[in-house]
UniProtKB/Swiss-Prot annotation:
Residues 241-260 have a biased composition (Low complexity). Gene3D superfamilies: Glucose-6-phosphate isomerase like protein, domain 1, Helix hairpin bin. InterPro entries: Ribosomal_uS2, Ribosomal_uS2_bac/mit/plastid, Ribosomal_uS2_flav_dom_sf. This is Small ribosomal subunit protein uS2. The keyword Ribosomal protein applies. GO terms for cellular component: cytosolic small ribosomal subunit. GO terms for molecular function: structural constituent of ribosome. The keyword Lipid metabolism does not apply. It comes from Oleidesulfovibrio alaskensis (strain ATCC BAA-1058 / DSM 17464 / G20) (Desulfovibrio alaskensis). It comes from the Bacteria. GO terms for biological process: translation.
Length: 260
């Protein structure tokens, strides 16, 4: 189990919220107190709520679902891209394009264009064009890859979203809620927890805190994937066993007739 620990959260500053004047009163239940004008998050609740969120991620992936990691703020970009990639999940780190989920069929056209350009550069087709046109196509490909690179293999909508800073990713939150996609989010003291299905109260600005959460959620995805493969193997083995038994039962009458 890849649960976060109290020690790990204290070391990475997960307990530091925003200035008290910038708080969202709805987060009051997750706040331990204040120190020097900064809200302090109740890490005992964070430990408990992270376990719930972690288990949701494991269950989702174990059932064959996919998770989309969303973190476009500078502090989150590297961790989100690295860890989501390690876990084989989707991610968005540059800019959330409106309609990424709610208008996915249109977004797919841009993804198809990106894949077509990548093939052109890989197989040398692009060399048929003049240098100026090649440069234009390269810029187009790089621009599309920057925004869509993390979801270019997404054939269907994800079954779960993991978000760093739901305030910043408000459009993504709205799209998920509209489509009924559950949201797991690192939710700081200035956020609205009512919009989140699985709240993880914590610092969503400190790089080390973000890395801690993103890494553990990626581990949860890998744990779920291992469970999925194990279940698949067990089901295949059981199917083969049942087929062998059925074949033996079918052959039994013929064997009896032959003996007679």
């Amino acid at each position: 189990m890849a649960y976060v620990t109290m020690k790990g959260m204290l070391e990475t500053g997960v307990h530091f919220g925003h200035q008290t004047r910038r708080w969202n009163p709805k987060m009051g239940t997750y706040i331990f107190g204040a120190r020097n004008g900064i809200h302090i998050i109740d890490l005992q609740q964070t430990v408990k709520l992270f376990r719930t969120a972690h288990d949701k991620v494991v269950d989702t992936v174990a059932r064959g679902g996919k998770v989309i990691f969303i973190g476009t703020k500078r502090q989150a970009q590297e961790a989100v891209q690295t860890e989501a990639g390690r876990a084989g999940q989707y991610y968005v780190t540059n800019r959330w394009m409106g309609g990424t989920l709610t208008n996915f069929q249109t977004i797919r056209k841009s993804i198809d264009r990106l894949k077509k350009l990548e093939v052109m550069f890989e197989d040398g087709t692009v060399n048929r064009y003049q240098k100026k046109e090649v440069l234009r196509l390269r810029r187009e490909m790089d621009k599309l890859n920057l925004v869509l690179g993390g979801i270019k293999d997404m054939e269907n909508l994800p079954q779960l979203a993991f978000i760093i800073d739901p305030n910043r990713e408000d459009i993504a939150v709205k799209e998920c809620r509209r489509l009924g996609i559950p949201i797991v989010a690192v939710t700081d003291t200035n956020c609205d927890p009512d919009l989140i299905d699985y709240v993880i109260p914590g610092n969503d600005d400190a790089i080390r805190a973000i890395k801690l959460f993103v890494g553990h959620i990626a581990d949860a995805c890998l744990e779920g994937e291992a469970m999925r493969k194990e279940t698949k193997a067990e089901n295949a083995e059981e199917a083969m066993k049942q087929a062998a038994e059925a074949e033996a039962e079918a052959a039994a009458p013929a064997a009896e007739e032959s003996a007679e």
